[in-house]
A protein has these predicted regions:
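Bacterial N-terminal signal peptides
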Residues: 6-15
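A short, structured loop/turn motif at beta-sheet edges
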Residues: 98-105, 133-139
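Short, low-complexity N-terminal intrinsically disordered segments enriched in polar/charged residues
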Residues: 16-55, 154-160
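Short beta-strand edge/turn micro-motifs at domain boundaries
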Residues: 126-156
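A solvent-exposed, acidic/Ser-Thr-rich amphipathic alpha-helical stretch
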Residues: 24-28, 46-100, 110, 123-124
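Positively charged n-region of N-terminal signal peptides that target proteins for export
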Residues: 1-5
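A short hydrophobic beta-strand element
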Residues: 103-113
Length: 160
């Protein structure tokens, strides 16, 4: 009887181990996705940035701007060939919380962003973001991204 009770107790104890390992792996993958988003921008790789999004992704920009839906619209919003490219020399992101439910993950974080456009360098010293990612055949991809910041704290200066 002791053997049966011990066996059942061990089975219950170790039954959660693979799930815990899977969750830790998913959390690491979501952190990597979050960092890859900043890295692709810093590298100036439009295709790399876009590869992180699902085809039906939505951006919900700051300051109440209208949502931007779909891969084509997002690419046009950020990488319109009629405009000079935005250069991102610095983007620090810190995932503060990560939630996972099945094939959906949510990252809430804080960020510092510096970008250069049309001769001006803009620094956002602090801001928030929420990234919702879904797991598909190609791994985790961004399905929805929103961010906010306080424009009164933006620092702007000419680019040398």
């Amino acid at each position: 009887m002791k053997f049966i009770v011990s066996t059942i107790a061990l089975a219950i104890l170790f039954a959660g181990r693979p799930a815990l390992a899977d969750e830790q792996e998913d959390m690491a993958s979501l952190r990597a996705l979050d960092q890859a988003y900043a890295t692709e921008w810093i590298d100036g790789d439009a295709d790399g940035v876009m590869s992180l999004f699902t085809e039906d992704a939505t951006l919900v920009p700051h300051h109440g701007d209208a949502p931007i839906k779909g891969h084509k619209a997002i690419r046009n919003f950020w990488f319109n060939p009629d405009y000079a490219p935005t250069v991102v020399p610095e983007w620090r992101r810190e995932a503060v919380e990560i939630f996972i439910s099945g094939d959906m993950g949510v990252i809430r974080g804080r960020a510092r962003l510096v970008w250069e456009y049309a001769g001006t360098r803009t620094t956002i010293p602090e801001g928030n973001y929420v990234m919702i990612a879904v797991r598909g055949d190609e791994g985790w991809r961004i399905r929805l991204l929103t961010w906010n910041d306080d424009p009164r704290k933006w620092l702007q200066e000419p680019v040398d």
